[in-house]
From Swiss-Prot:
EC number: 3.1.-.-
Region (Disordered): 1-21, 220-249
Pfam families (alphabetical): KH_N4BP1_1st, KH_N4BP1_2nd, RNase_Zc3h12a, UBA_N4BP1, UBA_N4BP1_C
Organismal lineage: Eukaryota, Metazoa, Chordata, Craniata, Vertebrata
Biased composition range(s): Basic and acidic residues: 220-241
Biased composition (Polar residues): 1-18
Cell compartments where the protein resides: Cytoplasm, Cytosol; Nucleus; Nucleus, Nucleolus; Nucleus, PML body
Chief localisation class: cytoplasm
Positions of the RNase NYN domain: 516-668
GO MF term list: mRNA binding; RNA nuclease activity; ubiquitin binding
Protein name listed in UniProt: NEDD4-binding protein 1
SUPFAM superfamilies according to UniProt: Eukaryotic type KH-domain (KH-domain type I)
Length: 848
């Protein structure tokens, strides 16, 4: 900023060494902008910013006669030395920037610069003292001096790199960073809270370091203006009320965090802010009348003053016990021993999770199933989303039973209102109840060796503490205490554990083999197969590519839909897609989104088209049944050029006989020129080497013993010999009562073996051995007689469906699949297959 004059001085009194006053000039036409920016500057930097006036105010001799605006105005900054310097650089970016840059970023990162109530953007400005604004989603504008702008741009580019690479922290650091980041974001909760929690862990760590490192080293100065004091008090009140306002997301996570551990002690930069409990309760979600009739069961110590007392006993090391008894049958799940230190057992955490989601109105069976599948260490938000999905599915499948169960869970039954032991007359009976609670939990932690006598005695003691009116209404049910102590291991957990083993895709830079066919990999099929049909595992694609590369293939193409590049928690290790695309191996099939609906081309068609052009092999476990009638060439590809696979963990495996036990071996199947396995043929064609099983048929006649190459005549369109059938032909035909001209399928592959009651081996007087038999079967024509003898009619393509038929099929499919998320898929299938009328086939495509 070009200054007309710069004046620096220090304050007087005790703050003389700490407070600095800097006066400088700015362009006169920026006066209104600076006055509007005054609150923003003072909020970003601990300084007192004042617009003093124009230079003409202090130099009356320089007043202009034409009444024009003054060229320069005086500005004053008062505060710590470092804070004043940074604020001055920031004002320089507002008034007279030396450098202006625009930086684009992925739209998914907009939550960083607009979320957390603008906290991260403010920290970025304080750290780099550049004027950083967000003119539009996906674009950042940076103005100021050269050094501040370069620093800000470098910091933003680092964020973008971590986001695009989806970098994760080491396993021992990631949980602590996630907890600290979640605590910080919830203190600045807004509509971007969920998006911020889904960021990569390395980016979360970088944002936390930005927020924690941005601490001005200068001491705070005392502001002399009473207006500034009032403004700071108002801002503080607004901030307190804002932090006290709980949202459904913060309600869920804060209650769990308050029981599990106190994360705030680990992060000095994240300070707790006091708030009123009544303010927080005033903004909770509205509950129904049925919910108000029953008392809630919170499992957080912060709500104890409202829902129940915390009783401490000096004999048990001041371990707090929450008395939450709503039903005698739920006694074991309601009374939870919360230890004061951090070593909370997994069994206690499991009970806390189950009971917490039960109080939200969800069925216990659904809650236990979801926690068992995902694990109790999963993020609460993901658990809540999955529980909501499972509840909707059960509601659709069993509407009558589930609705009754949900109504009971939400408190709409006719049971009497349960009372919490708060009143003084009940305290005498509550004391032995607490003793029994501790004994109950102590035996529960001991394991499954508890005797039934102890359980019954404990339940009898507990029953005596319950009021008489509740005893007659509710009958407790006997349940094992350790029913859910050990959640079952799931395939999802095994897959997630396998991802912890590091894998790198390294392809050797060496020439391959030229006689190998083009390999076309169905990326979606391979990725979902490796991800156990639950995750889109990009590692599976990399393993398949590495397998074929090591076998010498260099013509490899992988097809993956374009929308798989979007961030999704169910798509793992997306960096493999980027690596394969850079190598020219991966190709994305087109897809786009219009008004929230995805429009994607069928990637299977790209596989078949490329296989038709290159003569390649398609690696997939799909059978492509919907494309069999499209063209004869595609039908041949589907029959003869599909290569199936399997995964054994991270090991990609292929069968030795891709087309069956009588088909070619894997090396022959992948080679352009199959290896000649006969003794008399030097370079046979592929048709001579192998005929698919559907084409197997015996030769209609064999040549006589005195000649192998007799001329053939045509009769009824089939090849017939001129000589009569010889004894060799009689031996070749089975004698089981079937057609004489029908031979077993392995007649072209194996010599005849002696069987009781069937054909006998070839007589020695014929002078034919095994090699002569193969030479005898080999024709002199380009194709074997078996292929000529089979009538292969061209498939008849049915007429295209009429609009009315399409509407009928769509209505029928919607009745079968009433879920709303299936409608778009049904429309895609009907538009992609305009000739198909089979409702069963269409239903199978929807299920795929």
């Amino acid at each position: 900023m070009a200054t007309g004059s710069v004046h620096s001085s220090s304050g007087n009194g005790r703050s003389q060494a700490a407070t600095v006053v800097d006066e400088f000039t700015a362009p006169g036409d920026k006066k209104s902008l600076l006055e509007r920016s005054r609150p923003r500057v003072q909020a970003l930097f601990p300084v007192l910013f004042t617009v003093l006036g124009s230079l003409e105010t202090f130099h009356q001799s320089e007043v202009k006669e034409d009444g024009e605006k003054p060229c320069r105005i005086w500005l004053q900054l008062k505060g710590g030395k470092q804070a004043v310097g940074r604020a001055k650089e920031y004002l320089k970016g507002i008034c007279e920037p030396e450098m202006e840059e625009k930086q684009s970023y992925p739209k998914e990162m907009h939550c960083i610069f607009a979320g957390a109530q603008g906290s991260f953007l403010n920290h970025l400005i304080r750290d780099t003292y550049a004027n950083v604004t967000v003119p539009d989603i996906g674009v950042l504008s940076m103005k100021g001096g050269t050094e501040p702008v370069v620093m800000a741009q470098s910091r933003v580019q680092q964020f973008i790199r971590l986001f695009n690479d989806n970098v994760s922290l080491p396993n021992h650091k990631e949980p602590a960073v996630k907890k600290k980041f979640k605590l910080y974001v919830e203190k600045h909760a807004d509509k971007y809270t969920v998006d911020l929690l889904l960021l990569p862990s390395a980016l979360k760590s970088e944002l936390l370091s930005l927020a924690c490192d941005d601490q001005l080293s200068g001491e705070d100065f005392s502001r002399q203006s009473s207006d500034d004091k009032v403004e700071s008090q108002v801002n503080q009140k607004d901030e307190v009320s804002r932090n006290g306002a709980g949202t459904p997301v913060t309600e869920l996570t804060s209650q769990l965090d308050s029981v599990f551990s106190s994360v705030a002690e680990d992060s000095p930069c994240l300070m707790e802010r006091p708030y009123s409990e009544q303010d927080r309760l005033s903004v909770k979600r509205r509950s129904s009348e049925a919910e108000e009739r029953f008392s809630k069961k919170p499992f957080s110590l912060e709500a104890v003053q409202v829902d129940g007392p915390v009783n401490r006993n000096a004999d048990t090391n001041n371990v707090p016990i929450i008395d939450l008894i709503s039903e005698p049958s739920d006694f074991e799940d309601s009374v939870i021993l919360v230890e004061a230190d951090d070593n909370v057992s997994s069994e206690t955490e499991y009970k806390i999770l189950v009971n917490f989601f039960k109080t939200m109105g969800y069925s216990q069976n659904v809650v236990e199933k979801v926690i068992g599948d995902l694990g109790q260490s999963e993020e609460p938000l993901k658990l809540l989303e999955e529980i909501e999905k499972q509840s909707k599915k059960e509601l659709y499948s069993h509407p009558s039973s589930n609705s009754t169960e949900l109504l009971k869970a939400r408190g709409t039954s006719n049971l009497p209102k349960c009372k919490i032991a708060i009143a003084e007359p009940v305290q005498q009976s509550a004391a032995p109840l607490k003793t029994q609670c501790k004994a109950l939990l102590a035996t529960d932690k001991a394991g499954p060796s508890n005797s039934s006598h102890d359980k019954s005695q404990t339940k009898a003691t507990v029953a005596n503490t319950i009021p008489q009116d509740q005893k007659t209404t509710i009958a407790p049910t006997e349940r094992p205490l350790n029913k859910h102590s050990d959640p079952p291991l799931t395939g999802v957990q095994i897959f997630q554990n396998s991802l912890k083993v590091e894998y790198r895709l390294e392809l050797k830079n060496e020439p391959g083999k030229l006689d190998l066919k083009h390999i076309i990999i169905d990326g979606s099929n391979v990725a979902m197969s490796h991800g156990l049909k639950h995750f889109f595992s990009c590692r599976g694609i990399a393993l398949a590519v590495e397998y074929f590369w090591n076998k010498g293939h260099r013509n490899i193409t992988v097809f993956v839909p374009q929308w798989r590049t979007k961030r999704d928690p169910y798509i793992t290790e997306q960096h493999f897609l980027q690596q394969l695309q850079e190598l020219g191996i991966l190709s994305f099939t087109p897809s786009r989104t219009v008004l929230g609906a995805r429009i994607a081309s069928h990637d299977d068609r790209f596989l078949l088209h490329l296989a038709e052009r290159t003569g390649g092999i398609i690696v997939t476990n799909d059978n492509f049944r919907e494309f069999v009638v499209e063209s004869p060439m595609w039908r041949e590809i589907i029959k003869e050029r599909l290569l199936q696979y399997t995964f054994a963990g991270d090991i990609f495996m292929l069968p030795d006989d891709p087309l069956g036990r009588y088909g070619p071996k894997l090396d022959d199947f992948l080679s352009k020129q199959p290896i000649n396995r006969t003794m008399h043929s030097s370079s046979p064609s592929s048709n001579e080497m192998f005929i698919p099983r559907d084409h197997f048929a015996p030769p209609r006649a064999m040549a006589p013993r005195n000649g192998l190459n007799q001329p053939m005549t045509q009769r009824n369109g089939l090849s017939q010999p001129m000589a009569p059938r010889t004894e060799l032909n009689q031996h070749m035909a089975p004698r089981t009562g079937l057609n004489q001209h029908m031979a077993p399928r392995n007649a072209l592959r194996q010599p005849m073996a002696p069987k009781t009651g069937l054909s006998q081996p070839i007589a020695p007087r014929t002078g034919l051995d095994e090699s002569s038999l193969f030479q005898l079967i080999k024709p002199q024509e380009p194709f074997p007689p078996a292929v000529h003898n089979i009538a292969r009619p061209r498939p008849i393509i049915p007429p295209q469906r009429s609009p009315s038929e399409t509407m009928e099929l769509r209505e029928a499919l919607l009745k079968i699949f009433p879920e709303t998320d299936q409608r778009h898929k049904i429309n895609e299938i009907l538009s992609a297959h305009p000739y198909m009328r089979d409702l069963n086939a269409l239903s199978a495509m929807v299920l795929d």
